[in-house]
Amino acid sequence: MGVRQVIPRDAIPSVENPSFGTAYPGEGEDLVVAVGGDPPRAYPLRYLDFHEVVNDSLGGDPIAVTWCPLCGSAAVYGRRHGGRVLEFGVSGKLADDDLVMYDRETESEWKQSSGECIAGQFEGDTLSVRPAATMPWRAFRGSHPEGVVLQRPGGESEAAGDGDDPDDIDYGESPYDEYFEREGFGYDAYYGESTREWDREDLGPKTVVLGVEEGDAALGFPLPWVRGASGVVQTAVGGRDAVVFATETAGIHGYADPGYEFERDGEAFVADGTRWDSATGRAADGRRLERLATRRLFAFAWQDDHGPGAFYSP
């Protein structure tokens, strides 16, 4: 694992006291990290591009909503670890081109895509993943009309400027759009230099993957492969049965498989005599699927963490 310091610590400011409301000034196709709650909460990637970590609490459960733009990696972790509640910040380091967070209580360093502590008091430990999903804002609002959305935190961020010094944030800007369109991947590719090689032809390095882990087992579900399977895949990960849905409007979602045979019906799925919403796991008759604790990330980041064999194949 290659670790390097690329910007000063906290040059990208984490959010410690998030506020929420019902209004979001962005576009309907803007992606948000959605976390269940009463009411559900949405964290727009347009804001997370400039902050990368939001320290929050949901129903008394301290959580960290985390985002690494270079790895396309969205994951929500529990902040209660080792008998204390941790507060996370952005270390300014990358590990295999992935965000390295640090906790302000022990200054231990944590790899964002895996949740593993790579240096410090908790080295070798792994944070607990919380159920979450990444979906377009339009899908979140349609599925959760009672939901709330993170309001603009404001301030300065290194991601807002051209150098290493923080600059005033303009949330109307999208600093990673050009990177997402390039063939290369990783930190150097962000600056237009492709120094890493990708030796697979079956999927691209920045293919979106839904990562599911169960015990020591890990399986990544590439978005186009699930869509190519009529939008639904049912398989086992470790000792747990999983069902993964993917649609054009709602994105990719993973749930515990109840054992039904799902069939695509437009943007929904039919099983056991009723229709199921893939974005929420809710059925028309009131039943609800159990959302799995998953990550959303690019294929290269999943492969960095789990190896080339850790992908579902049709």
PLM features: residue spans?
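Mid-to-C-terminal functional-domain signal that highlights helix-capping/loop sites
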Residues: M1-P314
